[in-house]
């Protein structure tokens, strides 16, 4: 059975609806309700939730520099008063289990790419290239489809095994860390806001009496990275004429697996080979701080942590601050704990009346195990 609706009956209804909407949103009635006063637009803004595992560092100030003149050379002290806005900071160090989640995510993303590759069977369900209406979208991985660990086909098994290798001496199957590369992009909002980089030449100069050359070529630098035919990461900073917003996008590729050999290289003659083998990979050290991570890897972890959070937040993600490393001033401000204090505790002494250090200063000669630890301890223990 088909239903027909006459246009003649619809038009009066639409007209009435438009008049009603105009009455609701019209300026005259609003002005009458407010007595003609500008009271500001009211809108509900969702409160920013407390980030998991983080604490709020409230705004304040600190003095940066020497607090006393150099007694040897008599150099004048140099101090600066710096105001710091509030920010969130991790309550503890990033643990092995947290960073291992990052490494495994990178591994799984590589596997999904390969499972969708025709060289490994070409399962297109692991990569989304069209939306539900069949229109093309920016290709992205399908994280809703699980990896076929239990009963893989021959092609799938080749893909799953491609990120592992076998130790030539003891036959141990281990992750091929050289393949664990994380690619991410950042948009440089600060550079895009500078007037000299405005896409419209008329916006580059505030003085309207100054003539602006519309054909002026503005050069911009950006970071980019790619993997060459030998599997090596190539990082470049290129300069090119500014042409679009894409010129403010920087691309980075970072090998994310931590350097586990620091246990041997940084502590010679310490017999630390067992920590080199087990500290990062063993569940026994899940709650211990990750070590052997470079600044570039820490930046990549922040980018991944942001991406991971935004994917889980949905539309509310636009109100959430992105993860980043603290600045030098923010770190010092958080470490001091209080305004005007050299240390987070009262006074300028580094030891208490029993001779014990208040914090992790380099200790003197003595019994390093007296506090129950020889290497790093579980996070949050002190």
Residue ranges and their predicted role:
Residues 88-92, 102, 108, 114, ...:
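Conserved hydrophobic ligand-interaction patch in extracellular adhesion modules
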Residues 32-59:
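Post-signal peptide N-terminal segment of mature Sec-exported envelope proteins
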Residues 95:
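Acidic-aromatic/histidine active-site loop/patch
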Residues 71, 109, 136, 162, ...:
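Coil residues (strongly favoring Ser/Thr
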Residues 25-34, 56-57, 63, 68, ...:
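Functional-site microenvironments in short loops/helix caps that host divalent-cation chemistry
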């Amino acid at each position: 059975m088909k239903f027909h609706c006459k246009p003649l009956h619809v038009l009066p209804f639409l007209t009435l609806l438009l008049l009603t909407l105009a009455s609701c949103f019209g300026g005259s009635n609003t002005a009458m309700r407010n007595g003609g006063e500008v009271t500001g637009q009211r809108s509900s803004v969702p409160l920013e939730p407390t980030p998991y595992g983080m604490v709020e560092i409230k705004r304040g100030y600190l003095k940066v520099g020497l607090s006393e003149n150099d007694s040897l050379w008599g150099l004048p002290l140099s101090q600066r008063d710096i105001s710091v806005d509030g920010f969130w900071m991790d309550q503890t160090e990033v643990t092995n289990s947290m960073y291992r989640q990052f490494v495994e995510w990178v591994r799984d993303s590589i596997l999904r790419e390969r499972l969708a590759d025709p060289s490994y069977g070409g399962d297109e369900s692991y990569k989304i290239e069209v939306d539900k209406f069949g229109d093309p979208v920016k290709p992205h991985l399908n994280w809703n489809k699980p990896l076929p660990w239990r009963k893989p086909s021959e092609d799938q098994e080749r893909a799953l095994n491609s990120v592992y290798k076998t130790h030539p001496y003891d036959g141990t199957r281990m992750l091929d860390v050289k393949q664990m590369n994380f690619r991410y992009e950042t948009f440089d909002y600060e550079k895009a806001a500078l007037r000299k980089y405005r896409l419209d030449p008329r916006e580059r100069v505030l003085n309207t009496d100054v003539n602006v050359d519309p054909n002026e070529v503005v050069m911009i630098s950006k970071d980019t990275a790619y993997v060459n035919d030998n599997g090596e990461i190539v990082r470049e900073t290129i300069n090119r004429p500014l042409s679009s917003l894409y010129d403010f996008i920087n691309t980075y590729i970072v090998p994310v697996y931590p350097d586990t050999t620091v246990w041997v290289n940084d502590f010679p003659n310490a017999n630390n080979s067992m920590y080199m083998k087990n500290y990062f990979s063993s569940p026994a050290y899940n709650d211990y701080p990750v070590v052997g991570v470079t600044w570039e890897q820490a930046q990549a972890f922040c980018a991944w942590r942001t991406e991971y959070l935004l994917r889980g937040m949905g539309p509310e993600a636009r109100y959430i601050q992105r993860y980043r490393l603290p600045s030098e001033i923010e770190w010092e401000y958080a470490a001091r704990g209080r305004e005007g204090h050299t240390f987070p505790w009262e006074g300028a002494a580094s030891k208490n009346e029993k001779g014990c250090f208040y914090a992790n200063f380099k200790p003197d000669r003595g019994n390093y195990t007296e506090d129950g630890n020889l290497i790093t301890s579980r996070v949050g223990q002190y």
